[in-house]
Amino acid sequence: MTYYNVGKIVNTQGLQGELRVLSVTDFADERFKKKSVLALFDDKDNYIMDVEVASHRKHKNFDIVKFKGLYHINDVEKYKGCSLKIAEENLTDLDDGEFYYHEIIGLDVYEGNTLIGQVKEILQPGANDVWVVKRKGKKDLLLPYIPPVVLDVDVAAGRIEVELMEGLDDED
């Protein structure tokens, strides 16, 4: 079975079994909603068990999550440092123009017929995502995911078409 990372448990929160999660998904409200089923993996990426979300709330930059059956700090403390993942079969369909990170990472980025590089990471610094494009012989390119820059994403073809605005590529 294929799993996709949605967050990392960084600490406990209080005494009632809540966990502080650093989310790595654009869909935190969907992923951590009550009754959602997630998989727990240890720091060596070994599957531990499935967990069902009992409650979720936001606190500062974290998602605070509580799992069904784990209602005390002693039940959850051992999961600090573990990852939360979603099974591929539990992914929901997205609207046109929306993509899961795993669909974007690894795609080739082109400007016209010129290969620029490959998306290696997605950052979330603020208003829009920033795609980190690994290039040969040059430093990584930070590409904002905005309409004037990203013209087309064809996941099936493994290709992203962009138009680099002036100032985006400081190596030119």
Swiss-Prot record:
Provide the PRC barrel domain boundaries: 96-168
State any single GO MF term: ribosome binding
Localization terms from the record: Cytoplasm
Gene Ontology CC annotations of this record: cytoplasm; ribosome
Query: Which SUPFAM superfamilies is this protein grouped with?
Result: PRC-barrel domain (SSF50346), Translation proteins (SSF50447)
User: Main localisation, per the record?
Assistant: cytoplasm
Listed GO biological process terms: ribosomal small subunit biogenesis; rRNA processing
Record Gene3D superfamilies: PRC-barrel domain, RimM
Q: Give the UniProt keywords, A-Z.
A: Chaperone, Cytoplasm, Ribosome biogenesis, rRNA processing
* Subunit structure and binding partners: Binds ribosomal protein uS19.
Which comment does the entry carry about domains?
A: The PRC barrel domain binds ribosomal protein uS19.
Q: Which family does it belong to?
A: Belongs to the RimM family.
Task: Please describe what this protein does.
Answer: An accessory protein needed during the final step in the assembly of 30S ribosomal subunit, possibly for assembly of the head region. Essential for efficient processing of 16S rRNA. May be needed both before and after RbfA during the maturation of 16S rRNA. It has affinity for free ribosomal 30S subunits but not for 70S ribosomes.
**Full protein name:** Ribosome maturation factor RimM
Gene name of the encoded protein: rimM
